[in-house]
Amino acid sequence: MRDPENVLNSLQEHSAQSGYVYDRLYRNLFNREFFLRAYQNIYASQGNMTAGTDGKTIDAMSLERIDRLIATLKDESYQPKPSRRTYIPKKNGKLRPLGIPSIDDKLVQEVVRMLLESIYENSFEDASHGFRPDRSCHTALRMIQNRFTRCKWFVEGDIKGFFDNIDHNVMIGILRKRIKDERFLRLIRKFLNAGYMEDNQLHQSYSGTPQGGIISPILANIYLDQFDKYMAEYKKRFDRGNKRAVNVEYHKLSAKRIRLKRKLAKAQSEEEKQSLLESIRELDKVHKSIPCKNPMDTNFRRLQYVRYADDFLIGIIGAKEDAQAVKQEIGVYIAEQLKLELSEEKTLVTKATDRAKFLGFDIRVTPQSNHTKKTKSGSTARNYSGHVMLEVPTSVIQKKLLELGAMRIDVRNGTEIWQPTYRGKLVGRTDLSILDQYNGEVRGFCNYYAIANNRSKLHKFRYIMEYSFYKTLACKYRTTKGKIIAQYRIVKDIGVKFQDKHGNERIRLLWKDSLARDPYPLGKEADIIHKPKGILKKPSLGARLKQIGVNGAEKKLQRW
């Protein structure tokens, strides 16, 4: 059997060739080495230690079990088990269904995922950022900040119930364009049709991908890559003109200024010179208050597009009618070609100087400015306008603090007052556990909004969380907040002393890193287009699995 890394590298070589068709993919599922690699990948994920409908976890894996699984794949008797449905909370307070596959299904899905990623990753559009290696919400937001400059309108897009409404026939049809292997496609259809178990009842799946399934993200991207490519072609048709037309009034004033400067050079008397200088100064004030290009040039249009999962944002340089036409046309395409529907309440045409919502941020374009300012050299220059601002909404901070139970809102004289409060659910924990809980929550929230232009707003979030921490410890020890601050003060910081496993005293401090804006929270390399590198060689787990499987003994792995 070929080394999986060589197989995946070979598949990647043709990934960017849109017309290349792959065949004989299914035979890779007979390769034990692929399953050992899949085992390594899954074992690294704590969430994949959750038992599926078969009641087993990855720790129960053995070589014999892998061989039996391969045998069922060879004769196509393999049938995925219905996933066990559970629910996780969403940001809006509702619950999101999540399917937990059996461990055998996780392994097969991971092998399929590796194959699909090698085939498709290099062919995905640059505008796609969700569920991709080296891509994130931050890379999507940076693309918006870099490319949506001077946009006049936003089209906020949201596909209604995307993961639950993916059409299975459309999905297989899209895959068939690049994959000529019916056994491989039948396997994917089996996963799509596997259904789920809830309250001991089987529910069949007629559309959608299993949320929680390992292959769901890559299948979702393959599906919506059709929309990404449609938008790339739409942009080519939409864009018009090489540059904006000149502003006639601006250039008239420029010509007038030149004439005045010439007169000044020829002026004889001091009185005439002063008069001309005053005229030039007055002219400069008007000159610098109007744009040099015509911002309403109907012969200049631009469209920008960014997508993260089923949310997308379109920026338009053009008229409102252009933005409305874009919204209507993409709605028709999504309905007719992808059998999906845009959410009417979430798909909006928004003026760019107002605020569009995307990935938890408020996004706006700074309005046209007629003001000038002094530069470091002492000259005057026009304030730059039209750049994109990424902002953390106050409502998001408020909602997060209320969800965590870290504050209450009092109303005094009609004004809301945010008050830190203790968190009763944490009182029973150790001091170190309480500190770690707060540190993790503050660090995670602040790091996500590191790219925000108004990141200073996070000081209030951290302040509320800090004093909620004090009040939680005060509640635990039935004392006052002031005494807690004095007791846990370590020089200028606040921290908890504890002993490590060797009995040495350690100190962990309350998180107070800088809240200065970080435009590259993941590093500049995060914006570089990803090139798949195959599978990293990590032989330890596979080698251990082989040792356990010696002589065909059915031995279970223990966690190490």
Where are these regions (language model features)?
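Non-catalytic terminal/accessory segments
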Residues: M1-W560
